[in-house]
């Protein structure tokens, strides 16, 4: 049986809850990610910031505020004020099917993977898409082998 550990990303980018919205914005843009786990000083998982959360906390483009002023505003907002703390989580041993069901119902697009209170990985919808592609490749290869065997 596949578990969350088999598919999760362990090479994580995370910020601390006292980092700023500006740091989160820059990190998400540079790393091209949509989900940013947030940890405390001890490395314990405390929340999640999504791209949608970032947009909700951002200054509207309709406001006539220059870029530097916007960045100054973002630099004064700690992540603990805008992050989601009521986030569904998974353990590394959670069956992958259950993790998929949680992703579908929670609609966050990711599941932080926590063990002993510490963030150890993240499971995203993209991970499941990659798995689906691998399974389709394996199925197609199997079908080609069956066809070749039938022709002999």
Predicted regions and their residues:
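Tandem CBS (Bateman) regulatory domains
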Residues: 1-11, 51-88, 95, 100-104, ...
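The conserved cystathionine-beta-synthase
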Residues: 15-32, 38-39, 89-107, 114, ...
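Acidic (E/D-rich), amphipathic helical modules within compact regulatory domains
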Residues: 19-65
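Short hydrophobic beta-strand motif reused across regulatory alpha/beta modules
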Residues: 34, 47-50, 114, 122-129
């Amino acid at each position: 049986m596949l578990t969350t550990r088999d598919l999760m990303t362990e090479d994580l980018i995370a910020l601390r809850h006292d980092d700023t919205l500006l740091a989160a914005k820059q990190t998400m843009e540079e790393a091209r990610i949509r989900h940013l786990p947030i940890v405390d000083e001890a490395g314990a998982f405390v929340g999640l910031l999504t791209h949608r959360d970032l947009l909700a906390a951002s200054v509207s483009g309709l406001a006539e505020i220059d870029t530097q002023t916007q960045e100054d505003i973002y630099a004064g907002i700690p992540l603990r004020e805008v992050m989601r703390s009521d986030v569904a989580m998974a353990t590394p041993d959670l069956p992958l099917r259950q993790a998929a069901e949680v992703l579908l119902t929670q609609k966050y697009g990711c599941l932080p993977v926590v063990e002993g209170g510490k963030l150890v990985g993240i499971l995203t919808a993209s991970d499941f898409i990659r798995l689906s592609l691998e399974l389709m490749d394996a199925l197609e290869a199997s079908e080609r082998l069956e066809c070749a065997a039938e022709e002999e």
